[in-house]
């Protein structure tokens, strides 16, 4: 509806003004004053944006949200904030709903573009603006008749969780704050952006939308409208509820509670396409956090499947989001992180993956790093994990009397410690596997001498522990079916199995040979079907 060219070439606008003392005259004066000093394209955009939201015109709202707002931001507010609330209120007749939505974009812009990040006051004001928005839609007796595009609803929930994460990191960084600032944070702002508030909001959105019941109904082939309730019948509430489930996944992952992270998604069949997965950024974010949670739970097969599926999806649908540069950058970064995590999982749990994913791993030289990891290079494991992991946060901020240190990295270092402990337990397994693959029977003493030519009786006893570790680590819980990503059956991830009889290891190759016949039969049948359809087309 409104292109970027209409909103270019206007100058800066800031000046002082005086009040008359008469409330009505002052209000009229402010309206005229702010309208006069605001660039015409910004003023017209805000007026039209407000009108589109009032009328519920989704096409215009989405166009202005996805295209015009970023274009104006680039032209006028690249390194500065958008106009203050009172300036905008004067030209939109103090429209309460619009001002809340405008401030959501206003503070999001400050977080993304202002050098040095938002000030404490802006962080707190952003929190209270989110409270105003969620109170408006959750506390209402009847559903609020508000229409917003799904992409905005997703980015609103995603930004809400991001600002919580950002504030937690800001709060944990004591080295750049005075004692008075720390005291103020502990006394005056202890409840703002607290983990309890975040969880309460997200669970409230899930509950009011009945999204879990709707997803269960869909999986059972029942009309979801029968269980949606008055609020959940509306797309606005339904999508907010769905995106809140993904928000909860992210929050629990940031806290290091991986079981609960997967648990909150139970109504969603993670490994199946859904009618709700039409927002690429949401689908990619979901797979990233699910895959990471699986990896930390030592469910490597599920992690590999999750990462492989979404990386294939990114390869095939890149054109859908390439028009939005900031979203493209975010998705590319997350894809790079997932390639790093996939490389880790393939080292710890070798298995076949799609050839196109293998090709990317080869082209980007991941194989060199993977070889080093297979040889037990712990530093490569560590660097890959630090690059690819989420930016963890602590649910509890530092105390007011805590030493003046930077506590931001503490949660990440704890998760790294847990991960590296698991890696150390497995770093010798590739060597053990390589020897076992060469034999069908192998004496324990001979294997011990392969590993260490100077092996003693004690080393043979240690070898039994290593073989038991191999057995244990290669058996993983693997999801097969059902809505719960936590369910599954134990399967061996190794291509070989063995048992020990007295001092002899008996080894069996369990690798299943590929059957290509079924693949070609399916393709031939599909080709024949396509030929029949082409012949029936009348030109």
Swiss-Prot record:
Keyword vocabulary terms for this entry: Cytoplasm, Initiation factor, Protein biosynthesis
InterPro entries: eIF3l, PCI_dom, TPR-like_helical_dom_sf
Highest taxon of source: Eukaryota
Official protein name in the record: Eukaryotic translation initiation factor 3 subunit L
GO molecular function: translation initiation factor activity
Cellular localization per UniProt: Cytoplasm
Pfam family, one: Paf67
Single Gene Ontology BP annotation: formation of cytoplasmic translation initiation complex
Family matches, as PANTHER family: EUKARYOTIC TRANSLATION INITIATION FACTOR 3 (PTHR13242), EUKARYOTIC TRANSLATION INITIATION FACTOR 3 SUBUNIT L (PTHR13242:SF0)
Function, as annotated: Component of the eukaryotic translation initiation factor 3 (eIF-3) complex, which is involved in protein synthesis of a specialized repertoire of mRNAs and, together with other initiation factors, stimulates binding of mRNA and methionyl-tRNAi to the 40S ribosome. The eIF-3 complex specifically targets and initiates translation of a subset of mRNAs involved in cell proliferation.
Domain PCI: 306-514
Main location: cytoplasm
């Amino acid at each position: 509806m409104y292109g970027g060219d209409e909103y270019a070439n206007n100058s800066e606008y800031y000046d002082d003004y005086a009040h008359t003392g008469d409330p009505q005259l002052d209000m009229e004066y402010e309206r005229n004053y702010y309208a006069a000093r605001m660039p015409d394209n910004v003023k017209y955009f805000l007026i039209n944006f407000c009108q589109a939201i009032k009328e519920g015109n989704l096409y215009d709202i989405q166009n202005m949200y996805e295209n015009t707002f970023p274009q104006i931001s680039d032209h006028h507010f690249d390194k500065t904030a958008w106009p203050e609330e009172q300036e905008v209120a004067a030209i939109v007749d103090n429209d309460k709903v619009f001002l809340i939505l405008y401030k959501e974009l206003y503070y999001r812009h400050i977080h993304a573009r202002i050098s040095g990040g938002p000030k404490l006051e802006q962080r707190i004001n952003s929190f209270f603006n989110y409270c105003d928005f969620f109170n408006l839609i959750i506390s209402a007796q009847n559903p609020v008749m508000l229409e917003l595009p799904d992409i905005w609803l997703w980015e609103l929930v995603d930004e809400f969780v991001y600002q919580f994460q950002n504030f937690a990191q800001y709060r944990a960084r004591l080295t750049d704050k005075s004692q008075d600032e720390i005291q103020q944070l502990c006394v005056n702002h202890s409840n703002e952006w607290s983990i309890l508030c975040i969880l309460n909001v997200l669970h409230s959105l899930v509950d009011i939308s009945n999204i879990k019941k709707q997803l269960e109904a869909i999986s059972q082939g029942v009309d979801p409208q029968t269980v949606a309730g008055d609020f959940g019948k509306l797309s606005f509430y339904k999508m907010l509820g769905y995106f809140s489930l993904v928000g909860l996944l992210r929050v629990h992952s940031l806290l290091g509670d991986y079981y609960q992270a997967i648990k909150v998604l139970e109504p969603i069949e993670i490994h199946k396409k859904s009618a709700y997965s039409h927002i690429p950024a949401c689908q990619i974010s979901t797979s990233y956090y699910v895959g990471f949670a699986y990896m930390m739970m030592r469910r490597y097969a599920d992690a590999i499947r999750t990462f492989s599926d979404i990386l294939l999806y990114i390869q095939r649908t890149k054109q859908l989001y390439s028009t939005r540069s900031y979203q493209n950058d975010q998705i590319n970064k997350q894809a790079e992180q997932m390639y790093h995590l996939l490389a880790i999982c393939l080292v710890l749990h070798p298995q076949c993956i799609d050839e196109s994913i293998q090709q990317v791993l080869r082209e980007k030289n991941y194989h060199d790093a993977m070889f080093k990891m297979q040889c037990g290079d712990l530093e490569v494991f560590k660097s890959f994990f630090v690059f690819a992991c989420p930016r963890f946060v602590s649910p509890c901020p530092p105390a007011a009397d805590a030493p003046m240190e930077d506590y931001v990295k503490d949660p990440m270092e704890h998760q790294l410690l847990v991960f590296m402990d698991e890696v150390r337990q497995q770093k010798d397994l590739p060597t053990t596997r390589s020897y076992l693959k060469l034999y069908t029977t192998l004496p324990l003493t001979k294997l011990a001498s392969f590993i260490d030519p100077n092996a003693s009786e004690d080393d043979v006893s240690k070898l039994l522990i290593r073989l038991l570790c191999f057995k244990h680590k290669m058996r993983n819980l693997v999801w097969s079916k059902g809505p719960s990503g936590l369910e599954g059956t134990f399967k061996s991830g190794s291509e070989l199995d063995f048992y020990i009889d007295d001092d002899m290891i008996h080894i069996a190759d369990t690798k299943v040979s590929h059957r290509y016949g079924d693949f070609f039969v399916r393709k031939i049948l599909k080709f024949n079907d396509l030929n029949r359809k082409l012949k029936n087309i009348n030109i």
